[in-house]
Amino acid sequence: STSKYSEYVTRSWKHLVPVPSRMANLDRIAQLLCAYDVVGLQEVDAGSLRSGFVNQVKYLADNAGFNYVFDQSNRKIGMISQHGNALLSRIQPAAITEYKLPGLIPGRGVLEVRFGAGANALHVLILHMALGRRGRLRQFEFLAELVREYGYVIVMGDLNCGSDSPEMKALLAAARLRDPSPGLFTFPSWQPDRQLDHILVSSSI
C-alpha cells in the first residue's frame, strides 16, 4: 500500500508486476467487504501478470462470501494488465448492462446493475471517471442522460473530483442526484484531505 506521495514514483513498478503484499491487502479488503450486501469496485484486475494471475474480483467474492459477481475489464493489455470495474452482490441482479464512457483515451466504462423491475427498480452504476476535467464533463453528461428517467439510482465510484467542483454540481443537477456524505475525504489513503470517491443517490433514496 502507498503511505506517501513519493511512493507513487518509487513504487510505481508494483502496478506492473505481482508483489507478495498484494494478497495480504486483498485479504484485508475481503474482511471489510463482509459487512456489505452490494459492493462496487474500480481498478481491480481480472487475472493478469500485475496481479500474479489472480482474478482479484473472484478472490474477493470467494473470501467475502458474495454469490453474484460480474467484472467489466475496460483496459486489457494482453497478459500484462486486465483491470476495470466490478460488482459483488448478495442479492441477485435482474439485469447487468455495460457501457463504454466517451473520451479521447479509451478504457473507461460504466457497469449498470438493475435490481427489481418497473418503476420501483433500483439502478446501481459503478464507474471510474477521467482524470481531466474536459473528459469528466463529457462522461458526466453521458451518465446524466443514462439515469435521468430512473426513479431510484445509486452511483458509486472514483469520480476524480470533489462535491464542490463545477462538473459535480452540474451532474447532480442534471441527473437529479445528491451527495449524502459531502466532505467525506477519501484521498490520499494515508491522510485523506480530498473527496474523489463518491456514492451518489437519487432524491428518492
Regions found by a protein language model. Give the residues of each.
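Active-site-proximal beta-strand/loop segments in catalytic clefts of secreted hydrolases
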Residues: S1, E43-V44, Q72-R75, I91, ...
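Active-site-proximal beta-strand elements of phosphoester/diester hydrolases
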Residues: S1-H15, T97, E112, A121-A130
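N-terminal, active-site-proximal structural segment of metallo-dependent hydrolase catalytic domains
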Residues: S1-N63, K76-G78
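Active-site beta-strand/loop signature of hydrolases that rely on acidic residues for catalysis
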Residues: R28-S51, V113, H123-L127, L143-A170, ...
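Active site of divalent-metal-dependent phosphoester/diester hydrolases
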Residues: S48-F53, N67-S89, P106, N160-I205
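Charged helix-capping and loop-helix junction motifs
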Residues: F53-K58, R138-A144
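Beta-strand-turn-beta hairpins that frame and shape the catalytic cleft
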Residues: H83, S89-A94, P106-I126
